[in-house]
Amino acid sequence: MEKSKRLFIKSKRSFRRRLPPIQSGDRIDYKNMGLICRFISEQGKILSRRVNRLTLKQQRLITIAIKQARILSSLPFLNNEKQFEKSESTEKITTLRKKNRN
């Protein structure tokens, strides 16, 4: 029996605890865009609590702040970076066409 018990003992690995994403001095507010943008995906979705590693209360406050910022138009509902990239590339093409015509 002693041999079978020894098989299941795991070695203790040391691990480094990550810093919390929200420090004690950070204020969760819809005006704090630098903080809010860290918790939004590339598509503009609010990241889950497991991904953010936040407490339930912090996640609730972040969600409310993001929704307020979206309603007040300081944050887009969808992330439109790809649309801006396309518009810039089309501007380059049109300027090249105009140069070729002259």
From Swiss-Prot:
<keyword id="KW-0689">Ribosomal protein</keyword>
<keyword id="KW-0694">RNA-binding</keyword>
<dbReference type="InterPro" id="IPR018275">
    <property type="entry name" value="Ribosomal_bS18_CS"/>
</dbReference>
<dbReference type="InterPro" id="IPR036870">
    <property type="entry name" value="Ribosomal_bS18_sf"/>
</dbReference>
<comment type="subunit">
    <text>Part of the 30S ribosomal subunit.</text>
</comment>
<protein>
    <recommendedName>
        <fullName>Small ribosomal subunit protein bS18c</fullName>
    </recommendedName>
</protein>
<comment type="similarity">
    <text>Belongs to the bacterial ribosomal protein bS18 family.</text>
</comment>
<dbReference type="Pfam" id="PF01084">
    <property type="entry name" value="Ribosomal_S18"/>
</dbReference>
<keyword id="KW-0150">Chloroplast</keyword>
<dbReference type="GO" id="GO:0003735">
    <property type="term" value="F:structural constituent of ribosome"/>
</dbReference>
<dbReference type="GO" id="GO:0009507">
    <property type="term" value="C:chloroplast"/>
</dbReference>
<dbReference type="GO" id="GO:0070181">
    <property type="term" value="F:small ribosomal subunit rRNA binding"/>
</dbReference>
<dbReference type="InterPro" id="IPR001648">
    <property type="entry name" value="Ribosomal_bS18"/>
</dbReference>
<keyword id="KW-0934">Plastid</keyword>
<dbReference type="GO" id="GO:0005763">
    <property type="term" value="C:mitochondrial small ribosomal subunit"/>
</dbReference>
<dbReference type="GO" id="GO:0006412">
    <property type="term" value="P:translation"/>
</dbReference>
<keyword id="KW-0699">rRNA-binding</keyword>
<keyword id="KW-0687">Ribonucleoprotein</keyword>
